[in-house]
A protein has these predicted regions:
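Active-site flanking residues adjacent to catalytic metal/cofactor-binding acidic residues
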Residues: 36, 60, 130-131, 195
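Binuclear metal-dependent hydrolase catalytic cores centered on His/Asp/Glu-rich metal-binding motifs
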Residues: 71-73, 79-125
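Charged catalytic cores and adjacent phosphate/nucleic-acid-binding surfaces used
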Residues: 1-24, 29, 42-57, 64-85, ...
């Protein structure tokens, strides 16, 4: 957070101090941050950060109500937009309509529900990650004690709208996991940790004295919106610990084939790789031939006329695809 009162954004937020503290905390590792104030974007802080070449995602911490008879929960929204003055103004215009008061009481009638949020950001590429595990504002506490919920409806909401959840630490998640189990969701545990810090000089200390100790999230991906989204879909890319993790493992690096019929020149990355293409663009040819090349067995190939037997594969891992 940059502002203790989101209705009056802090124009003097010390971005340079925050960056200095993060670099010290991470041992000068590459990092990705989002300044998530309540229901608004602090334009001044974001533009100062971008001017300093900081890797950033535009984001805010929203109040969302499940239904009228319960308190709202907190939910981070991260938006895949270049951080420019015009883009920030456009997002703030939407947030101003949704939240005239940036710090509403959690039971205020004016707080939007999830469908209001989705409709308001129609046309944007965004992720929603509600609070989990924390003592306040967590979505698993946003129903009445003993309330019976329609599991099918709630499962649909979480599977279709939420990409993961946020907390200060990866500990104390039992209530969140138990809530998912009641809904029949067993694998929704993807977490991004957030500091809840308001004073950059004391980063990553939280606003509340009784909050859990902050546990940073280390991500094996590019420091971008897409890197976060990919990591949330593949939990092996996320590590929660204070020290920078060391991970060295080989993988399939490169696939190459060039002749009069075909030109393949593909660099692969560690972890999940996705082959995208239109109809008859060669997706199956590529994957099938890669498998056969690594297996050293082209018996039964349908693509001999393309010379796939000469496919060059750099595979120092010596792994064989399943």
């Amino acid at each position: 957070h940059t502002s203790s009162d989101a209705n009056h954004p802090n124009e003097d937020y010390d971005v340079a101090e925050l960056v200095s503290q993060i670099k010290s905390y991470t041992g000068n590792s590459r990092f990705l941050i989002s300044l998530t104030d309540h229901n608004m974007i602090n334009k001044s802080a974001y533009l100062k950060a971008i001017a300093s070449n900081v890797n950033m995602i535009m984001g805010a911490e929203l109040h969302i109500k499940l239904h009228d008879e319960v308190k709202s929960y907190h939910c981070h929204i991260f938006i895949n937009k270049d951080i420019t003055e015009d883009n920030i103004d456009a997002v703030n215009k939407i947030l101003d309509k949704l939240y005239e008061d940036k710090l509403p009481k959690r039971d205020a009638d004016t707080i939007p529900d999830i469908q209001d949020i989705i409709n308001a950001f129609d046309g944007y590429d965004f992720m929603l990650l509600p609070h989990g595990s924390q003592r306040h504002g967590a979505f698993n506490y946003s129903i009445k004690k003993g309330e019976t919920v329609d599991s099918a409806i709630y499962r649909s909401i979480y599977y279709n709208q939420f990409d993961g959840f946020t907390a200060r630490s990866n500990s104390g998640l039992d209530a969140t996991r138990n809530y998912f189990e009641k809904l029949g969701i067993g694998s929704f545990v993807n977490l991004i940790t957030c500091s809840d810090n308001y004073n950059p000089k004391k980063y990553p200390e939280p606003h509340s004295d009784d909050a859990e100790e902050f546990m940073p999230t280390w991500m094996f991906a590019e420091p971008t919106f897409e890197g976060v989204r990919l990591s949330l879909s593949e939990t092996s890319r996320l590590v929660y610990q204070h020290e920078k993790p060391e991970r060295t493992s080989e993988y399939i690096h490169k696939v190459k084939l060039l002749n009069e019929h075909i030109d393949i020149d593909v660099n692969l990355t560690e972890g999940l790789n996705v082959v995208i293409g239109g109809s008859s663009s060669g997706k199956t040819l590529f994957v099938d031939s890669l498998y056969k090349a690594i297996s050293h067995n082209f018996i039964g190939t349908k693509y001999s006329k393309y010379g796939v037997e000469n496919l060059s594969v750099s595979n120092p891992s010596e792994m064989k695809p399943y």
